[in-house]
Amino acid sequence: MYREANKERISEVKKAYREANKEKILDQQNIYTKQRRKSDPLYRLTLTYRRSCHRAFQSISQKKNVKSLKLLGLETWEELSKYFESQFYDHPKTGEKMTFDNHGRYGWHIDHIIPLSTAETEEDIIKLCHYTNLQPMWAEQNLSKSNKILDK
């Protein structure tokens, strides 16, 4: 087969293409991500979680070298969505129901019960990124909670 016999050559050609077309590729990736975020609630959930953990590691000048699912302590992203679904509650003022379609800026957020901002070490972040430290919370409640630990 041509591919097997020319692995290095193919790799070089692909690398050269990526170098020559960085902006075009980045634009395509951004369009894809934006569209998929809108149409796939589980994808949006995974990106949100990954970003929060990545930022937490950055805040203590560490690099995130652990897979997000391993940090969560789960096998699949579907397990996380089921965990959140089991905790969904109606909006206290409007009665709106939590769904994966209203997850985000104006709907509900992923709240860390013990805030990531309390982490001082890599071990702290690993503990705080575990799924048992997460809960769905309406955006305005989460924004007013900020980095506090609430009594139950």
Enumerate the language-model features and the residues they cover.
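Contiguous alpha-helical segments
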Residues: M1-H109
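Short metal-binding segments enriched for Cys and/or His
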Residues: S144-K152
